[in-house]
């Protein structure tokens, strides 16, 4: 069974405490320059985890990813190109 996952971006003052985020989910990426970490966890637990993480003194802010709510199914490019060509021809005539 596959669980729905969602990313949480955790902005931190210091990166020393990145290891402590592992208990909340999978730490996918850490940016040393911008001082943030991307944490993946179950979608059902996102709000609870973001509240818990935001209470730590080393956390500046917590943002949730909107990727699960975006449309990822696209029309084929060929159909779109064909429609655009027909529109151009009709306009030019």
From Swiss-Prot:
It holds the Pfam family DUF2129. Keywords: Cytoplasm. It is found in: Cytoplasm. The keyword Manganese does not apply. Coiled coil: none annotated. The keyword Cytoplasm applies. Signal peptide: none annotated. GO terms for cellular component: cytoplasm. InterPro entries: DUF2129. Belongs to the UPF0298 family. This is UPF0298 protein lmo2054. It comes from Listeria monocytogenes serovar 1/2a (strain ATCC BAA-679 / EGD-e). The lineage of its organism: Bacteria, Bacillati, Bacillota, Bacilli, Bacillales.
């Amino acid at each position: 069974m596959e669980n729905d996952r969602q990313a949480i971006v955790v902005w931190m003052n210091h990166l020393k405490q990145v290891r402590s985020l592992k208990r909340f989910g999978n730490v996918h990426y850490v940016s040393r320059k911008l001082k943030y970490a991307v944490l993946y966890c179950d979608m059902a637990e996102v709000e609870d985890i973001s509240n818990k993480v935001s209470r730590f003194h080393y956390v500046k802010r917590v943002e949730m990813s909107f990727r699960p709510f975006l449309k990822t199914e696209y029309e084929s490019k060929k159909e779109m190109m064909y429609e655009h060509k027909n529109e151009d021809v009709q306009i030019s005539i």
